[in-house]
Curated annotation (Swiss-Prot):
The chain crosses the membrane at residues 7-26. GO terms for cellular component: membrane. It comes from the Bacteria. It comes from Rickettsia prowazekii (strain Madrid E). This is Uncharacterized protein RP066.
Amino acid sequence: MTNNSKICLVSLICISGIYFGYQYYQNSKPVITIYPDNLPPKIRPSIIENNQVASVYSNIYENLITQDTNIQTVKLLPDPEQPMIIDSRNQSQNDKIFDRMSTLIPLIESNNNAKNATDLNIIKLEKVIKDKVSNAQNCRSNAGYKVQLGSVKSEAEAMAEGAKIKKKFPKILKNVVITTKKVKYDDGKFFYLILAGEYSSLSQAQAVCKKLAYNKQSCVLK
């Protein structure tokens, strides 16, 4: 008998032993048997003290059992108030007409006054708006347009950076004056804007800004 045959035989013997041992263990357990009980079924009543129970198989019916009521502890509520009877037939037709007219006249007068006041306010508001628009246009035409090239923390740094940008783009910023503007943060600190120009028209300022943006230089119209 070869070695392989011996190994196979030993393996079969081990597997058989494990299988029969497991079957013996399962058969040795006690068998559980369920027997029917002889207790009478519990049926909950559907009517308790002349009250029909909606859900018989719930615990609600247990709360419906009332106790003895003491008549001395019962509080009787008073009768409700009787409704008022208003007889409108005793009023004359003239009184009704007079009341209606006396009610409508103040409303008509107030509406007319309000309309006149509104018309006056509209005229005044239109005049104020036109004046503000014309003033803004005059200020813009006199001041011209500037181009923002950046922002820094100090005025000296702003002037130095502006000169550097002007030197970098001599053709675009030729004959342009570099200025600064002090601006306040919300937290109280300040920063400085680097501004170029003044350009007489918006289209001219936009053209300069487009050329700077094409050359990867930040630019904002002011």
